Design a protein with these regions (language model features):
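C-terminal charged capping/lid subdomain of soluble metabolic enzymes
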Residues: 48, 52, 56-142
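An active-site-proximal "capping" alpha-helix that borders the catalytic cofactor pocket
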Residues: 28-42, 65-71
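Oxyanion-binding "anion nests"
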Residues: 1-24
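Residue-level signal for inorganic ion chemistry
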Residues: 13, 35, 121
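Active-site catalytic microenvironments for nucleophilic, acid-base chemistry
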Residues: 18-22, 38-45
């Protein structure tokens, strides 16, 4: 797996690879879904930690990124990915399959995954995210 600054290139890939494996989407399209999901995870963490200002800031940045991806006709949500998947499945089954695929990720470290978390344009941190937290987010994300 990548180490050091190369890890920043994993932004969008942790969830994106799970989406790619399950949906059959092209790599870039799946990473677009993962990128938007990563912004959502950061926003959720900020708000659950009581930092609504940080949540609002990251949501504004996510809207900018979302607008660019939408202009490129890329899928933006897990539901978008499910609807374009090569095999029809229920929303819950699709999300559980994505979670299962994510647990095989090379960035997994026991009960955590090293995750590239966007903090703003050009600002990404690498942090461990618990698999349970990640699974909970995937189950509830748009």
């Amino acid at each position: 797996y990548e180490q050091g600054p190369r890890m920043l290139l994993n932004l969008g890939h942790s969830i994106g690879h799970g989406v790619e494996v399950i949906s059959g989407l092209a790599h870039g399209a799946a990473v677009a879904v993962g990128l938007i999901a990563a912004f959502g995870l950061v926003s959720r963490r900020a708000r659950s930690g009581g930092d609504s200002a940080a949540g609002t800031s990251i949501e504004r940045t996510a809207e900018r990124v979302r607008a660019v991806l939408k202009a490129l006709s890329l899928p933006l949500t897990l539901e978008d990915a499910r609807l374009t998947a090569s095999a029809a499945t229920s929303p819950a089954a699709f999300r559980e399959a994505v979670i299962e695929a994510m647990t095989a990720d090379k960035k997994r470290r026991g009960a955590d995954m090293l995750f590239a978390l966007p903090r703003g344009i050009g600002n990404v941190t690498i942090e461990p995210v618990g698999l349970e937290e990640l699974a909970g987010y995937v189950r509830e994300a748009p």
